[in-house]
């Protein structure tokens, strides 16, 4: 997406700052998990607090790059990103790993690519639901569940308010049992 920084070194710097802060956040959450498992609660909390700070720093730079849109735009961008990951990035990584004698890593790249493909499909399906106003309404009768309290409603639409906990329809999703 074009910004006032497009084509400048500042744009590259913003992209690098976003990437660096994003990677730092992930590392610190991993480090927090290790510290917690080893019994260092204070250190774990400091890693997590710093990770949360890094997330906000990354958000500053991503917003400057106009990286955050409305939900439909974000779903489209997410789907496009996942498409790149499974069709190009991981496919290329797997090919390189194979050529360099790392067949196990190549296989893992391919497995992750398959997951990224599923992510793309999920985002595209959700985007279609947003674009067709089908997130909270369907043409056929469905079972809707309040994500807050678990109340079940059967009908073509989620209710405007949950009759049990009074949360808005934004808290409803299609009910599925996976057991």
PLM segments and residue spans:
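Non-heme di-metal
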Residues: 1-179
């Amino acid at each position: 997406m074009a910004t006032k920084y497009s084509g400048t070194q500042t744009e590259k710097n913003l992209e690098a700052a976003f990437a660096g802060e994003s990677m730092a956040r992930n590392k610190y959450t991993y480090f927090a998990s290790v510290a917690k498992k080893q019994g260092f609660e204070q250190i774990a909390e400091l890693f997590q607090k710093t990770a949360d700070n890094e997330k906000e720093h990354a958000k500053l730079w991503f917003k400057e790059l106009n990286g955050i849109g409305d939900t439909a735009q974000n779903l489209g961008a997410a789907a496009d990103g996942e498409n790149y990951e499974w069709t190009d990035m991981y496919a290329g990584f797997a090919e390189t790993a194979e050529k360099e004698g790392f067949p196990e890593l190549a296989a893992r790249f391919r497995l992750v690519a398959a997951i990224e493909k599923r992510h793309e499909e999920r985002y595209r399906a959700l985007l279609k639901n947003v674009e067709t106003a089908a997130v909270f309404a369907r043409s056929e009768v469905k079972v809707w569940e309040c994500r807050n309290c678990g109340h079940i409603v059967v009908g073509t639409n989620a209710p405007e308010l949950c009759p049990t906990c009074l949360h808005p329809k934004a808290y409803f999703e299609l009910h599925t049992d996976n057991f």
